[in-house]
Swiss-Prot record, chains A, B:
This is SLIT-ROBO Rho GTPase-activating protein 2B. GO terms for cellular component: cytoplasm; glutamatergic synapse. Keywords: Coiled coil, Neurogenesis. InterPro entries: AH/BAR_dom_sf (IPR027267), F_BAR (IPR031160), FCH_dom (IPR001060), SLIT-ROBO_RhoGAP (IPR051627). Residues 181-203 have a biased composition (Basic and acidic residues). May interact with SRGAP2; formation of the heterodimer alters SRGAP2 function. May regulate cell migration and differentiation through interaction with and inhibition of SRGAP2. In contrast to SRGAP2C, it is not able to induce long-lasting changes in synaptic density throughout adulthood. It comes from Homo sapiens (Human). Residues 362-400 form a coiled coil. Residues 181-214 are annotated as: Disordered. Residues 22-324 form the F-BAR domain. It comes from the Eukaryota. The keyword Hydrolase does not apply.
């Protein structure tokens, strides 16, 4: 009746179920391990972030101190060596103004990097400490919850196992009862078969036909038939009972199967996701705020620095020789102001304070005047030429000294490799052959300019 | 004839002139001193600028090295402790991405500050060296030219002095000759007066009336008159000659006066200005370029840093729990993927794989179903309540962890005094009472959230 090729044996079914449950149990363990690992990584990351910002705070503080020292060194120098009025005087000159702003900028940057360091230590790191605490606490709680969920799931799986086994048992009982019933039926059949052989063949082979047999035989047969009937009835009852139990057990198994699948689905699809959500509760948002604090600090530093650079740029734009000359001359007014005109001093009450241009000096003066006029017009022509040469020479010098060679953007365009920065950068200003050539040209032109000036009475 | 109250004496005039020339000479000396001082200050300023940038280059290099070490420390850690695949896996998580970008940023800043240092050393400082050389050379030449101009001016002043003295001399000679002439005229007059007394009173008192006197007396008188006449003629001639000389001398003096005043004017108004221009030739322009190189370097650094911060900001914006959860589950797919559904395992070829819901189990199942439905509707109502509570609690936590408390602009707003930065800044994050309160609230809410979840089966 049982065909091994067709039906799985109980053992096989149990073994399969065991395997399936073992796999799930292994997964559950791995899930916990995975959460542990994520927790560990998160704790490590937050520790790294703290260490990173602690170390960076030190670096920023170091940088700030060095910048402050640098500024103080030159500010002290300016304050000590010269008296205050002199210093104040010099400040009106545009290059000195640039220099002062440079020093101010260094002071400003020093201060800003101290602030940055302070924000790292007193704001950003505490945030990471908090995130770390929160994460640890949430992971712990989530793991507890997760463990409970897993235990519940395992309970469901065990229940399914037990329900399945019950079903097997009751079904086996039912099958057994059925086979026993069938056996009884067979025996009854056999008994009836005997009666038919020993008696008339007319009699149909039914228990009711026993009325026709002989009394004695009849009695024996009747008692035997009754026995079998009784047994059959018993077995029938047993079978019916077992069959019902098996049906109920199967129903329980089927219901437990649905419930287990639903539980497994709920655990894998919802609970695990919720569990990770609980571990993450606020993590990303808090990390976001900590990093935004960092960004806010950096951007404020940048803005402050930029403001300083703007001030310097403005001062550089105002570098102006003409106004500096004006300021210098005003500053040393007594040194540069022209003296009183020399007045005619009449000798012993000499009344004539005008040039006497009458005879006999008239002709001589006229001649002299003509000579001077002729000399003057020659000089004027010469002068025009010299002026043109000088202007052209000056323009050449101006062109040389105002060439726009100050853009260093190239130096900040690195190759993707991030390597060999030095070699790229060092090729800048001085090593360019064009610079040397330009400088030679500048000095030559300058020399020429001076020569021309000197030759023609400045 | 000379009235001391009315005319200045020669000595006074000479003394006044001397004083005036001395004053000019003192001014000229001061002018040279002033140029020297400006040259010295300029050389000093350029030296200071070189020292400043040399020292700043060191500071930037130091800063760069420290940043590099910082980045390497954590990058090495990430590389060594875990295998590459694992690291790669983790990189898909948004917090790890932020962390990697932070380290990248430090590397980028390290590189940029090296570049900055390099530009200081190899571009900006050489520029200042050049400007210093140029300035020194130009000052030297300008001073030579200035000295020549001053010598020329002194020559003109000396000439004026000598011309003035000549005028004084010739005018004195002229006056003397005139007075001698006048004396002769007086004598002649006297002689004629004698003749008139000794002779007729009719005769007019003229030299021609001598014809009427006695021969002897006539002869004596005539010879005396002739003598006087001769002397007078001589004196007349002398006077005329001296007068002409005096006029010429005065003319020379007046011309020299004009020339001197013009020279002085030219020197004070044009030459001094030109001299300063020559000292400044290219100075402001070259300084401008050197400082613009500095600005270009700083602005490029700023831009590069800003790009890095933008990348970090973008990563911070992309901090997302949901997608991280998704990625984690994909990463550990074998751990998180739901197992196969549990299938009905028929026992010994049991053909019924469906719930048997006929008599005699029907009524029992129906009863059970009704019980479950009633329980389910109770749970649904409860669930709705719990869900609402949980959502509200979660929202509270979300509100706490997403509060926008990351703006640190205030820390960069210093008081004008630039002092007491520390005290202002340290009042930030942790010391605020609101933070402690908020944290307590957060943990309480979190606890409540977990309790609710646990009570109602997660």
């Amino acid at each position: 009746m049982t065909s091994p090729a067709k039906f799985k044996k109980d053992k096989e079914i149990i073994a399969e179920y065991d395997t399936q449950v073992k796999e799930i149990r292994a997964q559950l363990t791995e899930q916990m391990k995975c959460l542990d690992q994520q927790c560990e990584l998160r704790v490590q990351l937050l520790q790294d972030l703290q260490d990173f910002f602690r170390k960076k705070a030190e670096i920023e503080m170091d940088y700030s101190r060095n910048l402050e020292k640098l500024a103080e060194r030159f500010l002290a120098k300016t304050c000590s060596t010269k008296d205050q009025q002199f210093k104040k005087d010099q400040n009106v000159l545009s290059p000195v103004n640039c220099w002062n702003l440079l020093l101010n900028q260094v002071k400003r940057e020093s201060r800003d990097h101290t602030t940055l360091s302070d924000i790292y230590l007193n704001n950003i790191i505490p945030r990471f400490v908090q995130v770390s605490e929160d994460s640890g606490r949430l992971f712990k709680k989530s793991k507890e919850v997760g463990q409970q969920l897993q235990d519940d799931l395992m309970k469901v799986l065990n229940e399914l196992y037990s329900v399945m086994k019950t079903y097997h048992m009751y079904n086996a009982d039912s099958i057994s009862a059925q086979s026993k019933l069938k056996e009884a039926e067979k025996q009854e059949e056999k008994q009836i078969g005997k009666s038919v052989k020993q008696e008339d063949r007319q009699t149909p082979r039914s228990p009711d036909s026993t009325a026709n047999v002989r009394i004695e035989e009849k009695h024996v047969r009747r008692s035997s038939v009754k026995k079998i009937e009784k047994m059959k009835e018993k077995r029938q009852a047993k079978y019916t009972e077992n069959k019902l139990k098996a049906i109920k057990a199967r129903n329980e198994y089927l219901l437990a199967l649905e419930a287990t699948n639903a539980s497994v689905f709920k655990y894998y699809i919802h609970d695990l996701s919720d569990l990770i959500d609980c571990c993450d509760l606020g993590y990303h948002a808090s990390l976001n705020r900590a990093l935004r604090t960092f960004l806010s600090a950096e951007l404020n530093l940048e803005q402050s620095k930029h403001e300083g650079l703007d001030a310097i740029e403005n001062a550089v734009e105002n570098l102006d020789a003409t106004s500096d000359k004006q300021r210098l001359m005003e500053m040393y007014n007594n040194v540069f102001c022209p003296p009183m005109k020399f007045e005619f001093q009449p000798h012993m009450g000499d009344m004539a304070s005008q040039l006497c241009a009458q005879q006999p000096v008239q002709s001589e003066l006229l001649q002299r005047c003509q000579q001077l006029q002729s000399r003057l017009s020659t000089l004027k022509i010469e002068n025009e030429e010299v002026k043109k040469t000088m202007e052209a020479t000056l323009q050449t010098i101006q062109d040389i000294v105002t060439v726009e060679d100050f853009d260093v953007s190239d130096c900040f365009q690195y190759s993707n490799s991030m390597e060999s920065v030095k070699s790229t950068v060092s090729e800048t200003f001085m090593s360019k052959p064009s610079i040397a050539k330009r400088r030679a040209n500048q000095q030559e032109t300058e020399q020429f300019y001076f020569t021309v000036r000197e030759c023609y009475g400045f």
